[in-house]
From Swiss-Prot:
This is Uridylate kinase. Catalyzes the reversible phosphorylation of UMP to UDP. Inhibited by UTP. One of its GO terms (biological process) is 'de novo' CTP biosynthetic process. Transmembrane segments: none annotated. It is found in: Cytoplasm. It comes from Burkholderia vietnamiensis (strain G4 / LMG 22486). Keywords: ATP-binding, Cytoplasm, Kinase, Nucleotide-binding, Pyrimidine biosynthesis, Transferase.
């Protein structure tokens, strides 16, 4: 079976790295994620990653607690840097060549984000991990995923979550919630579905960049998507 996508952008939430822990990075969880990524890389698909930082610090929560929102968001960007380094290290142990590019300069630790360099690294078969969101406060890492995906020419944004798609309501709170197989960006925005923020949806809609929402906890889901199988929910123009 041939690959459905040549280049994809994988959005990983920081919370997904916690596994069953309450905080931080669960090593077994990150190793399992890397095993899924290795399968996709082995198929020849070029993979970029945007990673969140909510397992360490959330800027929105900091702002709500009375901290200056911009300061809180910069702290959140630094949290994504920690996650990116952990993911890169796990990939190295799995034999995957990965590069971290940061929207905030931290030259002694990672490379700065340079679009042509990122594209070249993807073409060389390296995994490129984008850290520090967009580099600007008030923008989520979901928006960073939409932005970087558009910049590097990804064919789809793969949003890895703890649920297996987009639901009409929170399935944890509403047992009658139903899962969408497909949904348009406009409908997702008008229904205020919280799987991604409206800015990310709008950017992907304008760039005609589809989003597939799937469960990171479902074994083999990432590989099945790359092979073109129907997994999770497709958000489209």
């Amino acid at each position: 079976m041939s690959n459905a996508y040549k280049r994809v952008l994988l959005k990983l939430s920081g919370e997904a790295l916690m596994g069953d822990d309450a905080f931080g990075i669960n090593r077994a969880t990150i190793e399992r994620m890397v095993a899924d990524i290795a399968e996709v890389v082995g198929l020849g698909t070029q993979l970029a990653v945007v990673i969140g930082g909510g397992n360490i610090f959330r800027g929105v929560a900091g702002g709500a607690a009375g901290m200056d929102r911009a300061t809180a968001d910069y702290m959140g960007m630094l949290a994504t840097m920690m996650n990116a380094l952990a993911l890169q290290d796990a990939m190295r142990h799995a034999g995957i060549v990965a590069r971290v590019q940061s929207a905030l300069r931290m030259d002694q630790v990672v490379e700065p984000y340079i679009r042509p360099r990122a594209i070249r690294q993807l073409e060389e078969g390296k995994v490129v991990i984008f850290a520090a969101g967009t580099g600007n406060p008030f923008f989520t890492t979901d928006t960073a995923a939409a932005l970087r995906g558009s910049e590097v020419g990804a064919e789809v944004v793969l949003k890895a979550t703890k649920v297996d798609g987009v639901y009409s309501a929170d399935p944890k709170k509403d047992p009658s919630a139903t899962r969408y197989t497909t949904i348009s960006f406009d409908e997702a925005i008008s229904r205020n579905l919280q799987v991604m923020d409206a800015t990310a949806f709008a950017l992907c809609r304008d760039q005609k960049l589809p989003i597939r929402v799937f469960s990171i906890n479902k074994p083999g889901a990432l590989k099945r998507i790359v092979l073109g199988e129907d997994e999770g929910t497709l958000v489209h123009v």
